[in-house]
Amino acid sequence: MEVFNIKIGFGANEVTLTILPMDEGYYKVIYYGGILGAVRLDNDHMTWEKVPDDEIEAGDLPFYRHDLSADRLDVVLDEHTVHQIGEEIHA
């Protein structure tokens, strides 16, 4: 699979994320040029889960740094956001 973009609702806003499929079976979630995290289907292939940060191979990209003073939404990969991302990946 190739890199693609998705849009998800985040609060009252909509956020565009870049999704980078990995050979290891997970999808890196890129936001403003940094790795926000990664998602994958759990063992039963029914539910999406967040990949622990120490299991993500960063490669050439830095991890995203949260900055509350920046002029952008501070997206957090909570359970709801992970589910939305997974639904968009399979849409």
Residue ranges and their predicted role:
Residues M1-Y27:
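Negatively charged, low-complexity tracts enriched in Asp/Glu with abundant Ser/Thr
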